[in-house]
């Protein structure tokens, strides 16, 4: 099973080798059918202390490092930090691109039917 990969923003880099990452996601409310933003904070391992507050990072699931830390930073502002998880990042990027392409295709089909 592939590891989960999330993209978020670093909100705190005050701990040694640990950053707090805020991951936003959008869901549809089941009753009102309105998009709602939900967010969650994850503690992620940053081996080289390279991440700073405000950086956009990708984190990947890993075996537990501590009680709260089960994620590792592998990508920061367009640069890969850990080559050990490169295949997980590539798989997630392919999955995201495929989802975006199918979403665009569905929007085009809906537009075509409406015209």
UniProtKB/Swiss-Prot annotation:
Keywords: Ribonucleoprotein, Ribosomal protein, RNA-binding, rRNA-binding
GO MF annotation list: rRNA binding; structural constituent of ribosome
SUPFAM superfamilies, per database record: Nucleic acid-binding proteins
Leader peptide range in chain numbering: none
Annotated TM spans: none
GO biological process: translation
Lipoprotein keyword on record: no
One Pfam family matching this protein: Ribosomal_S17
Keyword Repeat: no
GO cellular component labels: cytosolic small ribosomal subunit
Reported function: One of the primary rRNA binding proteins, it binds specifically to the 5'-end of 16S ribosomal RNA.
Family: Belongs to the universal ribosomal protein uS17 family.
Known partners and oligomeric status: Part of the 30S ribosomal subunit.
Name of protein: Small ribosomal subunit protein uS17
Organism the protein comes from: Granulibacter bethesdensis (strain ATCC BAA-1260 / CGDNIH1)
Lineage, broadest ranks: Bacteria, Pseudomonadati, Pseudomonadota, Alphaproteobacteria, Acetobacterales
């Amino acid at each position: 099973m592939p590891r989960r990969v999330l993209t978020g923003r670093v909100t705190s880099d005050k701990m040694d080798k640990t950053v707090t990452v805020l991951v936003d996601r959008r869901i549809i409310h089941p009753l009102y059918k309105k998009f709602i933003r939900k967010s969650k904070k994850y503690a992620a391992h940053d081996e080289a202390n390279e991440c700073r507050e405000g950086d956009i990072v990708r984190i990947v699931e890993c075996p537990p490092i501590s009680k709260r830390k089960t994620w590792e930073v592998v990508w920061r502002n367009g640069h890969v930090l850990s080559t050990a998880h490169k295949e997980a990042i590539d798989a997630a990027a392919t999955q995201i691109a495929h989802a975006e392409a199918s979403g665009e295709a569905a929007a085009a089909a809906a537009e075509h039917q409406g015209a």
